[in-house]
């Protein structure tokens, strides 16, 4: 049973990959470089996190041009990392990349590390979005694709607690890309609030 897990080197996706592996999935991590400012820092942490958890090294989808086509605070340092964080189509890009990869390795399941939708900030972080995406992705790749987001049952605090219990190791969650997290971006704030 194979699953493509979208992996960023962050807490949520690392825990997701570990849980999938523990459930018996053969995990194929996929790191998407969409031109985000944090790409290199995220990738190095992603490689280390997968290794720490006994999971194969991630395959990299190099789609850097997306960040130039769709600039946001995550892809352009001239834009505000919080106020202009929404990157239209980002999760759709991730899911289409994962579904296409899944089709080439005979996997029917893809996983994304979205959390409890009560706290979603963007329109592509809801169950409704995922249900509609699943239909589109199955049509797009010519096979049934199951989109799973098991962490949607949990808050950030619960994900942090589960990660500690699983001892998943060091992860990286910062949109700026500096080695020391900025403490200002949405990812940092979410982590800090969840850790309180």
Label the predicted regions.
Residues 96, 170-193:
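Local cysteine-cluster metal-coordination motifs and their immediate loop/turn environment
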Residues 1-166:
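ATP-dependent adenylation/nucleotidyltransferase module used to activate substrates
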Residues 79-82, 166-172, 192-196:
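A polyampholytic, Gly/Pro-enriched intrinsically disordered region
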